[in-house]
């Protein structure tokens, strides 16, 4: 799994955006890097938390706490890694 790494190319948008399941994450920031050569755009949902892990599904990267991952996703192990 690729993990999202924060760098200068990531633009943060400070409002919730619907992701694939149609649920809006609470208190989140949305980071949208510029599209790559293939034109795809990776969107990261970042929960306001000191502890965070990355979940990829499959074109969407969601950064949130392990507890929130367990609530939101079924296929998730103790470390919060998506399957």
Swiss-Prot record:
Q: Which UniProt keywords apply?
A: Plasmid
Domain of life per record:
Bacteria
- This one is known as Protein TrbG
Q: Which organism is it from?
A: Escherichia coli (strain K12)
């Amino acid at each position: 799994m690729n993990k999202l790494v924060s760098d200068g190319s990531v633009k943060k948008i400070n409002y919730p955006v619907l992701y694939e399941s149609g649920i809006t994450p609470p208190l989140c920031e949305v980071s949208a890097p510029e599209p790559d050569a293939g034109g795809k755009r990776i969107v990261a949902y970042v929960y306001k938390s000191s502890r965070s892990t990355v979940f990829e599904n499959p074109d969407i990267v969601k950064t949130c706490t392990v507890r929130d991952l367990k609530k939101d996703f079924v296929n998730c192990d103790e470390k919060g890694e998506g399957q």
